[in-house]
Each structure stands twice: as C-alpha cells, then as structure tokens.
Amino acid sequence: MSNHTHHPKFKTLKRAWKASKYFIVGLSCLYKFNLKSLVQTALTTLAMITLTSLVITAIIYISVGNAKAKPTSKPTTQQTQQLQNHTPPPLTEHNYKSTHTSIQSTTLSQPPNIDTTSGTTYGHPTNRTQNRKIKSQSTPLATRKPPINPLGSNPPENHQDHNNSQTLPHVPCSTCEGNPACSPLCQIELERAPSSAPTITLKKAPKPKTTKKPTKTTIYHRTSPEAKLQTKKIMATPQQGILSSPEHQTNQSTTQISQHTSI
C-alpha cells in the first residue's frame, strides 16, 4: 500500500475515515444528552458511509491486481527483428549441396577396418550403402515420359520373363491426345490389367421377317328351299339368245310351214 498512497482514491478514503471518527465522537455526545432519534439517524448514515468505503477499497485492490498481471510493455521492433534472425533459413539447392558434400567428406574420412589376425584390410560396407542412399536422395526425380515408338502404330511385343518382370508406367489415355506414341501404352496397360477383364456381349440373331398374306373372306348366304327350286327351274329352261340344238331348230321350221299352209 506504500506505493499507492498518492492515488486520489486513497486520499478520499483517508478523509472519509477521519470524518467518520469525528462523526462517532459527535454521536456519543448526543447519546449522553438523551437524543435517541438523532443517534439512530446518524448511525444509519455511518453504516452507509462504511459500506461505500469498503466497496471502493475492493475495487481499488482488484484494479491493482489486474494491472500487475497484464504486461504493460509491448515487444519492440528490435526484439521482433532478433526473433526473425534466429529462425533457420529455408533449404535451397546451395545449402543442400553443401550439406551433401559435408556428409560425403565425413564418410570418406573414416579409416578402414583392419583385421589384426589375418593382416588384411577391408573397407566398411556401410559406407557404400550410405553413399548410394545419399546419391539417390540428391538426384532430383525426373519426370517420366512415355518411350517414343519409331514404328508408330505397331505396339511392342509383350516379352514376359518369369525371372525379370518389368512393369511399365501407367499412362492414362486422357493425356494421349495428339501423341501417337502414347496410344500403344494405353492398349498394353489395358491388356495387362488383371482386374479389368474384357466383357463379352452376345449379339442376338435377328429374327426373319414374315409377311402375312391377306386371307380371302368367303361370305355364306343362307338360301330357303323355295329359292333353290327356282334356281333349278331357271337352269332347266333355256334362255333366249342361246344357241339351241339342231333338233330344236327343225321342229321350229316344221311348225312355221304348217302355219303358212293353213292360211
């Protein structure tokens, strides 16, 4: 509290405390003179003053504690620059080559193992394997390009050896637009793919077309027995204009002659 004695709120608290002391002395004097009503009003006002003073002190302590907890000063530009300088530089080709040469120099500087019993010297086998790994890591990955076929349309033959089996790179057919060397690779990849079996579609034989001939409709009329008799009579009597037999003609000529003589 010694550091905060000059705060204006603390000064007001001191003044209120002194005033309360004088107020208590005055109340005691009034109580001696039997002025109870004035004493009661004075006590209530005193209680209100003490409560307000306690609330003010609590607020002051809370504000002081928060001020101590929060950092008052922000990091300066020099501190931020120092932090940036401490960050490691990004890996570039020059840095990578320098680290690669340092690793090779350390591996080559190791002395060979000497066998004292047989008197022969031999190099450590792990150095060769390490050098091979480092070289494989140092070489950048080259972009795979499809091999150029000189014949163009004729795809290469599939030479499958059981001992040395080589797998060709997968080339999607969507990237083969305008590249004649890429089309045989797509065909080879489709032939070698075990999962994608060729689907056989059976074509149904077309049925022969048959043209239906129109059928003749026969109409049957029911005839009565009287109509049948009339048709028979008509068939029996010869019609006029039809050539008759020679006997019939001779009979007609004789009848005509007899008629003329009688006249």
Swiss-Prot record:
InterPro entries to which the protein is assigned, alphabetical = G_prot
Biased segments, Polar residues type = 98-129, 151-166
Can you tell me where the transmembrane regions are?
38-66
Q: List the disulfide bonds.
A: 173-186, 176-182
- Point out the glycosylated residues in this chain: 72, 80, 87, 92, 105, 127, 139, 163, 199, 215, 231, 251, 253
Task: Extract the ranges annotated as region (Disordered).
Answer: 69-166, 197-218, 242-263
**Which GO cellular component terms, listed alphabetically, does the Swiss-Prot or TrEMBL entry include?**
extracellular region; host cell plasma membrane; membrane; virion membrane
Q: Which residues lie on this side of the membrane: Extracellular?
A: 67-263
Q: Where is this region: Binding to host heparan sulfate?
A: 187-198
Q: Which residues are listed under the site Cleavage? A: 65-66
Side Cytoplasmic, residues = 1-37
Compositionally biased spans, kind Basic residues: 204-215
GO BP of this protein: symbiont entry into host cell; virion attachment to host cell
Q: Does the keyword Membrane apply?
A: yes
Keyword presence, Disulfide bond? yes
Locate the compositionally biased regions of type Low complexity: 72-86
UniProt keyword annotations, A-Z? Disulfide bond, Glycoprotein, Host cell membrane, Host membrane, Host-virus interaction, Membrane, Secreted, Transmembrane, Transmembrane helix, Viral attachment to host cell, Viral immunoevasion, Virion, Virus entry into host cell
Tell me its family: Belongs to the pneumoviruses glycoprotein G family.
Put simply, this protein is called: Major surface glycoprotein G
Origin organism is Bovine respiratory syncytial virus (strain 127) (BRS)
What is the primary gene name for this protein? Answer: G
